[in-house]
Amino acid sequence: WAPRPLRAKSTLRALALSGDEAYARALCVMAPDARSAIFSKAMTRELGGYRAEQPLIDLMRNAPARNGLDRAQYADLKFWLPGDILTKVDRTSMAVSLEAREPLLDHRLVEFAAGLPHNRRVSGMEGKFAMKRAMEGTLPGEILYRAKQGFVLPIAQWFRGELKDAARAAARSETLLDTGWFDADALSRMAEDHISGRRDRARELWQLLMLDRSMSLLGNTA
């Protein structure tokens, strides 16, 4: 397997060039400069230069690793897997009374894979290289080497269609603006840029909508 952003060819090239910074940036929903643009001046002062991706960068810089791929995979094991994908699998399976098991999480298999040379884990732009080779003869080629099919939702279209009012409402939410964290004009521009088709801000708007819903339900504890 390769870390999440390495599934994009451009990010693999970026990792080869600039390591931890490139990988951390690829994981972010918003680039640092885009985040800064929507924060209020007071919030920017309070952050004092802190970046949300700093824990990931620190993990990579301190990883017991031989190269950039090792550092990225180490950070995935410590940060992205437990904090994102495994949590989602656990919660969604338990919500429907299923007990999920991830066989590839066996610690002996993980240790074996971590010890493989980088060119046995990623070959050119192809991830999961060793696993695919190992399964040849067991799985047919059209299954083993078919293009990945992700679980992508059409949120960009939603926010330009049936959810455009929800996007505007989130950008103008009193719950969010009362925190003092955001620049109101910047949030409105972000929503209108997306709705008009000038830019794709779907992921940022989704995060904003989820934050608004969460704070409305749970209250502002900031």
Segments (PLM) and residue ranges:
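Adenosyl-5′-phosphate
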Residues: A8-A222
